[in-house]
């Protein structure tokens, strides 16, 4: 994957302003609410019975932060995303058996969360760079499935 200097700047510039805990929690909560079938991968998280329960669930919040922290690893390693996510791909494929389509869904939700939090700064160019990033990350996470 080739990243232009502008794409790198748009990604790293916005990333520096992201509250990882809040945006991560919101992104994972939205995934579980909008795509309820994804909840089956989180049965150990306790009460996921309603949007209110999901939004208030501390395990959802903690895992959302963990997920978005790993996105930070992608931002730091734009030229080596495939290797950055090799172990996570193995874990999600071999041990957790997560449908790789869910990585794409979460990426799309992250775009929505970023747009909501950074409305003015999230220009079409910025969105395009981030859309490319979430696609590359989803592809890297799905790699062990092929």
UniProtKB/Swiss-Prot annotation:
GO CC terms in record: blood microparticle; haptoglobin-hemoglobin complex; hemoglobin complex
What residues does the Globin domain cover? 2-146
Which tissues carry this protein?
Red blood cells.
Top-level lineage group: Eukaryota
Q: Which InterPro entries match?
A: Globin, Globin-like_sf, Globin/Proto, Hemoglobin_b, Hemoglobin_oxygen_transport
Q: Where are the transmembrane segments?
A: none
Name a single GO biological process: hydrogen peroxide catabolic process
Keywords attached to this Swiss-Prot or TrEMBL record, sorted alphabetically, are: Heme, Iron, Metal-binding, Oxygen transport, Transport
Q: Where does heme b bind?
A: 63, 92
**One Gene Ontology molecular-function label:** haptoglobin binding
Give the record's subunit note. Answer: Heterotetramer of two alpha chains and two beta chains.
Family, per entry: Belongs to the globin family.
Annotated function: Involved in oxygen transport from the lung to the various peripheral tissues.
Q: What is this protein called?
A: Hemoglobin subunit beta
């Amino acid at each position: 994957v080739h990243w232009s200097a502008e794409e790198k700047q748009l990604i790293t510039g916005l990333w520096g302003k992201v509250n990882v805990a809040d945006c991560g929690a919101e992104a994972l909560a939205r995934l579980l609410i909008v795509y309820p079938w994804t909840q089956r991968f989180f049965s150990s998280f306790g009460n996921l019975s309603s949007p209110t329960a999901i939004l208030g669930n501390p395990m959802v919040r903690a895992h959302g932060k963990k997920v978005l922290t790993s996105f930070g690893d992608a931002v730091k390693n734009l030229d080596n995303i495939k290797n950055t996510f090799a172990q996570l791909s193995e874990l999600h494929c071999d041990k957790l058996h997560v449908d790789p389509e869910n990585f794409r869904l979460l990426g799309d939700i992250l775009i929505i969360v970023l747009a909501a939090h950074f409305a003015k700064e999230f220009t079409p160019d910025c969105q395009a760079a981030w859309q490319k990033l979430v696609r590359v990350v989803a592809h890297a996470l799905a790699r062990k499935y092929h």
